[in-house]
């Protein structure tokens, strides 16, 4: 009843405290007597009464700003004038500084500049990655002094007459050719003055039946094909250089003969290259 009186505002002084008994299933042992009194309940007048008028006086009187979005619930906040709105003009391009001007007119130029920067960055990153990978791969390979000292032993009995066998030596293809009697006579009869890189067949071999060459074309470094070409020796498919059975250039753009490495015969059936 006191709470009702507190919420009654100006009618609180005329209200009095009352008690009402409700009959129950059990009879009470002692009948409670409530003496009647005409005194008004004592209220704390210093305490503010929570009513509509008092709460309205405490509420802010400034206008509200409501925000609504599809991804977040609606919210209401007070409008603050002391907040500094961030300015992103320093990060914008001159073409889009004016907010009232359409950016579609300068979109092509801006896209072109972005594509140019992206392409330049991609090329730079690819070049740097290529150098890093090349350095990493070269660090795992043998050093130059080890490669210079490396040698390879070749068993000549494994190469039949008229055939050419390829080996890997110091990272390059090595050709070992077992020439027939016909090939030996044919290459020995070639006129040296007709050759682009003049060199006699006997200057390129230690034993006439064995020709040992580095299988790298002297034009642009391609690997020639054995037993091919117009002269029955080697043919480079990259740019059409023709070599004879002695490895001498006879036709095509290659300027020099195939290189002859250093080698020695340790026996009739064994040769060491390097």
Swiss-Prot record:
The keyword Transcription does not apply. Residues 141-274 are mitochondrial intermembrane. Its cofactor is [2Fe-2S] cluster. It catalyses: a quinol + 2 Fe(III)-[cytochrome c](out) = a quinone + 2 Fe(II)-[cytochrome c](out) + 2 H(+)(out). GO terms for molecular function: 2 iron, 2 sulfur cluster binding; metal ion binding; oxidoreductase activity; ubiquinol-cytochrome-c reductase activity. The chain crosses the membrane at residues 104-140. It is found in: Mitochondrion inner membrane. Residues 79-103 are mitochondrial matrix. Pfam families: Rieske, Ubiq-Cytc-red_N, UCR_TM. Its EC number is 7.1.1.8. [2Fe-2S] cluster binds at residues 217, 219, 236, 239, 241. GO terms for biological process: mitochondrial electron transport, ubiquinol to cytochrome c. Proteolytic processing is necessary for the correct insertion of UQCRFS1 in the complex III dimer. Several fragments are generated during UQCRFS1 insertion, most probably due to the endogenous matrix-processing peptidase (MPP) activity of the 2 core protein subunits UQCRC1/QCR1 and UQCRC2/QCR2, which are homologous to the 2 mitochondrial-processing peptidase (MPP) subunits beta-MPP and alpha-MPP respectively. The action of the protease is also necessary for the clearance of the UQCRFS1 fragments. Its main location: mitochondrion. Keywords: 2Fe-2S, Disulfide bond, Electron transport, Iron, Iron-sulfur, Membrane, Metal-binding, Mitochondrion, Mitochondrion inner membrane, Respiratory chain, Transit peptide, Translocase, Transmembrane, Transmembrane helix, Transport. GO terms for cellular component: mitochondrial inner membrane; mitochondrion; respiratory chain complex III. Gene3D superfamilies: Cytochrome Bc1 Complex, Chain I, Rieske [2Fe-2S] iron-sulphur domain, Ubiquinol cytochrome reductase, transmembrane domain. Residues 187-272 form the Rieske domain. Disulfide bonds join 222-238. It is a single-pass membrane protein. Binds 1 [2Fe-2S] cluster per subunit. Fe-S cluster delivery to the Rieske protein is mediated by components of the iron sulfur (Fe-S) cluster assembly machinery that reside in the mitochondrial matrix (including HSC20 and LYRM7). The Rieske protein is a high potential 2Fe-2S protein. Belongs to the Rieske iron-sulfur protein family. This is Cytochrome b-c1 complex subunit Rieske, mitochondrial. The lineage of its organism: Eukaryota, Metazoa, Chordata, Craniata, Vertebrata. The gene is UQCRFS1.
